[in-house]
Regions:
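A glycine- and Lys/Arg-enriched "phosphate-lid" helix/loop adjacent to the NTP-binding pocket
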Residues: 85-130
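Post-Walker A helix-loop "phosphate-sensing" segment adjacent to the P-loop in P-loop NTPases
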Residues: 14-25
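Short glycine-rich anion-binding loops that position phosphate/pyrophosphate groups of nucleotides
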Residues: 70-72, 94-96, 147
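NTP-dependent small-molecule kinase module
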Residues: 15, 129-163
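ATP-binding Walker
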Residues: 3
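Walker A/P-loop
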Residues: 6
Length: 163
């Protein structure tokens, strides 16, 4: 949810010589529609079920960096499934920093688009509060605050090789 997972993931994959998969893009390709459209047509529950199935389809991939959606770890035991299948990285960001990143792209994010700017920060705080218990299970936690993407991807790479 705006922490830079996809951008950092692409850089990380390049540094490691790995392939890169963005789960949101994979979902949109498989379902031939945007996540926003899917939410509108089928709702969040259906989206989360399909997302969990798609995540499990990535099990056969090797040497691949996978950027999940922000909610992916929080449903259908996805985080517990991801942990033995790879190294999970949580890019930690404070709510206000996420707000500043998301304020101009909230229309592309189904869980945020109905919120006016005044209530957006509160929604982000609530989502983080609900999701934190899952994010904290990650193998690696790195602050994404005030760090250039190139530096962030290098920090993640260093942490992975230390594991």
């Amino acid at each position: 949810m705006g922490s830079g997972k996809s951008t950092a993931g692409k850089r990380l994959a390049a540094h490691c010589g790995y392939a890169f998969v963005d789960m949101d893009k994979l979902f949109e390709t498989k379902h031939n529609c945007s996540i926003e459209s899917y939410f509108e047509q089928f709702g969040e529950d259906s989206f989360r079920k399909e997302e969990a199935l798609l995540l499990r389809e990535t099990a056969s991939l090797e040497n691949t960096v996978i950027a999940t959606g922000g909610g992916t770890p929080c449903f259908y035991d996805n985080m517990d499934w991801m942990l033995p299948h790879g190294i999970c990285v949580y890019i930690e960001m404070p709510p206000k920093a996420l707000y500043n990143r998301l304020i101009n792209s909230k229309s592309e994010r189904p869980l945020l688009q109905t919120h006016c700017n005044a209530s957006l920060l509160e929604k982000i705080q609530n989502l983080l509060s609900q999701r934190e218990q899952y994010y904290q299970k990650a193998n690696i936690t790195i602050s994404g605050l005030d760090v250039e993407i190139e530096k962030l991807s290098m920090l993640i790479c260093q942490n992975i090789y230390e594991k």
